[in-house]
Amino acid sequence: MIKRLIDNLNYTFREFLIVSSVILLITLIVIKQSEFKSIDIFKGKQLHQGGYYIGKILKTPKNIFDSTIKTEFKNLNKVIEDNNLIKNGYPFIIYTSKTNEFIQYIAAIPINNCEKIKQPAKYVCNYFPKQDVLTVIHKGFLQDRNKGWEILENEIAKNEKKLLNAPFEVFWKGIEQSKDSTTWLTGLYYPIK
């Protein structure tokens, strides 16, 4: 009987060790992920090549902007499929105006050309011009990209640059390519003269 108690005690202790180890491992992973900080790298002046795009003109409250944009890119992909168009780059947003409450913008995806497209209401097919831009590469969480925009605004003020066109951002790598948000890449651009 004592042997059986010792065997049960050992079995329970082993279970305790296994469960404790798993909990410790999960805790370490969560702490490590919470330590990640998004990175913004100023790249200076670059040439953005431009090209044709199909997009939708939108005005969204700031507090639901990030969730709305995911839906709008899905809708744009459907329009591209329905019109048998070929994507020619990464999805992007052209910011036409911002207030404290709303963001007005064009959610867009590059395509080869704008011929023979059945455009639903509020959709546009246009050419985005080749232009000089100040660039910041944002790596990490999308909700942290405001620091990148601040870097661009400070550079414009410091160097007395003039905006030539609406600012825009390109989503190079996002949730569609990787669930690991620490690897997401977004290009932030201010067109300049």
Residue ranges and their predicted role:
Residues 2-193:
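A solvent-exposed interaction/effector surface
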